[in-house]
Amino acid sequence: MLEGCILADSRQSKTAASPSPSRPQSSSNNSVPGAPNRVSFAKLREPLEVPGLLDVQTDSFEWLIGSPRWRESAAERGDVNPVGGLEEVLYELSPIEDFSGSMSLSFSDPRFDDVKAPVDECKDKDMTYAAPLFVTAEFINNNTGEIKSQTVFMGDFPMMTEKGTFIINGTERVVVSQLVRSPGVYFDETIDKSTDKTLHSVKVIPSRGAWLEFDVDKRDTVGVRIDRKRRQPVTVLLKALGWTSEQIVERFGFSEIMRSTLEKDNTVGTDEALLDIYRKLRPGEPPTKESAQTLLENLFFKEKRYDLARVGRYKVNKKLGLHVGEPITSSTLTEEDVVATIEYLVRLHEGQTTMTVPGGVEVPVETDDIDHFGNRRLRTVGELIQNQIRVGMSRMERVVRERMTTQDVEAITPQTLINIRPVVAAIKEFFGTSQLSQFMDQNNPLSGLTHKRRLSALGPGGLSRERAGLEVRDVHPSHYGRMCPIETPEGPNIGLIGSLSVYARVNPFGFIETPYRKVVDGVVSDEIVYLTADEEDRHVVAQANSPIDADGRFVEPRVLVRRKAGEVEYVPSSEVDYMDVSPRQMVSVATAMIPFLEHDDANRALMGANMQRQAVPLVRSEAPLVGTGMELRAAIDAGDVVVAEESGVIEEVSADYITVMHDNGTRRTYRMRKFARSNHGTCANQCPIVDAGDRVEAGQVIADGPCTDDGEMALGKNLLVAIMPWEGHNYEDAIILSNRLVEEDVLTSIHIEEHEIDARDTKLGAEEITRDIPNISDEVLADLDERGIVRIGAEVRDGDILVGKVTPKGETELTPEERLLRAIFGEKAREVRDTSLKVPHGESGKVIGIRVFSREDEDELPAGVNELVRVYVAQKRKISDGDKLAGRHGNKGVIGKILPVEDMPFLADGTPVDIILNTHGVPRRMNIGQILETHLGWCAHSGWKVDAAKGVPDWAARLPDELLEAQPNAIVSTPVFDGAQEAELQGLLSCTLPNRDGDVLVDADGKAMLFDGRSGEPFPYPVTVGYMYIMKLHHLVDDKIHARSTGPYSMITQQPLGGKAQFGGQRFGEMECWAMQAYGAAYTLQELLTIKSDDTVGRVKVYEAIVKGENIPEPGIPESFKVLLKELQSLCLNVEVLSSDGAAIELREGEDEDLERAAANLGINLSRNESASVEDLA
């Protein structure tokens, strides 16, 4: 029933491969059938395949809905009686009892029907991809024993698509996982500023409920704060819990500070202690023993008010050594928790290192690091939605209680008690407005994949970027293998938003685990163990590239390892507990796609990882010559390629679909997505890469999507690059490009814009979509069909009509003559105004699609809307000056000049280079990876052959056999931290194959003699030449360049608006005025501040003078000066404007006969204010 909403099984395997034999083998053979043969420089065999990259989303959602697949995996883990997220909420809520306790309502067994419409239809018709949710509701009348059971509809529940996204009102959204402080008990250490004493404190933080804080102050007394109220001696709380002074002395007699606290405590007995606490918590209310007892119980010991959650209970038990190994049943505090916490704090303050709890368990006594990943957990999508459902259900609970008391007992059924509106509203509110439900980043497949794996510390219950300090943003040793230390945004969110590491997974408590190979007595075994950050701290871990022999033993007697808090040292191999599974274990997917990452500075690697997400899909994608081996898995898991579900033979292929005859005799047709618009206006297009008659295996890629080539992620193009200055045109990161890339559409991308218009009912009548538009010539209407909608294939530019629409105008007073004519000729056609949909300013393209939704065709439309038309306009954007290009190493730049091919520097065989980058962009930025990529790119393009006749050279000793020879245009991979070495690169450069003339163009140092394309003379020095992977980023000059003639003005100041969206002007600010003053350009400055800005009268007169060819009149008084006067007058200051002779001047409000006349003659609207769109401007 739910198979359509969730992904297939995770591709994770727990069996390790055998250790590498003495002669290296290439690890290029991918587990994906039909994958391109990318030869790899990897020296290590990875024992664990990369897990499903979307599992963090899909597994969590499956837990929420309690899917069969989740139940199977829970059973494999050994969970007894697993409970899904929805079941958990219903279990917590049930039973809802009325105020007398005579009636109760219970919920159980949540289940879903099939989804209402497929994903494509939901996107098309602005629907939500959702399935109806039903629960079994049982009403019990305790007085009569009567039970009424019904299946109740609880609203449409948004479902997750196969790609790990949600479709809400037609738009694709992603719910980001949230990093929060785990509930539990946290001990802290601070230095008192006045006495330099070390003070200790502890916070017991619940998932829901009041905080409990204990501390030792500078006077050496132990205090407690309940619910952040005033501090009291801790013995008051113990007495309130029923402890006598003798019991306190018996348990805490070892501690001097506890004895002194007890002496300073003036309360006697439990009752007095309870009343003392009540006065602090409820000041002003009359205290009674019963109310004080009830308050304390409700605060910490009742499940309705206080919830540590399972994870909080687990953390408290682990920290304090309580109930170790027992199943977690309760999620409230216990008296033993409070006592053990106080004892732990006292021992910590006294400098003890261990503590034995009553059960006989010995636990270490130490402070907690709040930024450690053992203390921070993930709220994944399932838990976030569950919390929102819990909010909706608690709102519904109040309604149910009220209805129980007001309705007739005999007539009550579950259906009459339940109002599902609060639940539906809570879910809608979460998906529509929560900070963690985000508009999906769909620039390219990688940006979507990274968005789903994002970890955010922001959002409700998290941090705020203003208050977050450096410590919480910093890289922590416990991030290793869990959160990428490289990929995070630049700017105010740095360190608060991260990305999940490649191999990381989330355990049932929400802690991030990472896999390790178990080491037993110095032998690396095949067993894979997942560890949380807490567990890892207790072990010694070796890195993945520690040399091991064929038996799995460490080659070196001492092994480099890391211990707790990131300490690194050499230890004997027998002391090693675990070993990393892969060198790329610490980085995220985007970072793992940067070749030679190990040679890049971290700041530039961060930019490289982020800029890959901004690459736009090109007309023809091209896989990188130099990859990292991550491209295939990233493309498949991103979900934009089409993958064969079962093995079979291709029966039929067209641009729109592929039909596969499966081996079991069934037939399956896969539909292609053709020229669809992504969330960011890029083009999502799928193309088959198989032919009729081909054999395909299950899991094989059969069609490419955007930014993929042969099933691999392909974000840019392999371009021949020369790294050299050229006449200063590539100064300051500017880039020089060959015109070949423009002419041959190498870096051309397609962008699709969606334009929408609706016809509504207005007070004056219904709007109408029509071709009959007043005062519009036939040439303008040439591309509109009989309905008034533009035809598909029409070329349109700014101002052209896409959809004709007329809106009724208010009836005007008729003259006697008009009344006479109307009486003679009958009813005159109603007056209408043109409100057509036009192409916005600065846009153009070709119409590629039209969707019409009409109430007559029974389409679902918002209230008051009769017809809705969407027009899709595609624009082919060639690369041009001002566009931004980037490599994968943070090497970004803007195109400064496009040179004719014949002017570009060329190699000795006449091959012109495609792109020239400046040498200055490398040394101080320390991203040497781009140079190594350029060298290896040249080797891959030209091919190589290592002469092994006299034996394999030393530099090639560690290379796999298939890397001793490569054909031209071979695709290679150099995995991060396990890629090609510098010596190997130098050796390969000396072994490159000659061109067809027998010449080797690039020397062993990676440099070539280049010739000036203009003169034909050689440059005086050899230049680094090779192939670099270059991406075209989403920062396109067409979206940014803008010019204004006349446009909208601000209503108050009458100054032009700003920004391209408002068709605004350029801001001439304070500093620009200073520049004008410095040059003495008085008249230019006066013009800028008056007639070009907010002199409302003057600008109309100037316009008239220009039209008539007369001299420009004197400027008047700016409107902003009048606004300033009004503001001063509003402060009760009498401000007058005086002439040079001291006479008061009356400022006119623009009622000038000449002005009105000029405006009428020229057709200028003087009341031009802010406008919703540029088309509305007169």
UniProtKB/Swiss-Prot annotation:
The keyword Nucleotidyltransferase applies. Changing residue 149 to A: Does not affect association with TRCF, but weakens interaction with CarD. The keyword Nucleotidyltransferase applies. DNA-dependent RNA polymerase catalyzes the transcription of DNA into RNA using the four ribonucleoside triphosphates as substrates. The RNAP catalytic core consists of 2 alpha, 1 beta, 1 beta' and 1 omega subunit. When a sigma factor is associated with the core the holoenzyme is formed, which can initiate transcription. Interacts with CarD, TRCF (Mfd) and RbpA. HAMAP family: RNApol_bact_RpoB. This is DNA-directed RNA polymerase subunit beta. The lineage of its organism: Bacteria, Bacillati, Actinomycetota, Actinomycetes, Mycobacteriales. The gene is rpoB.
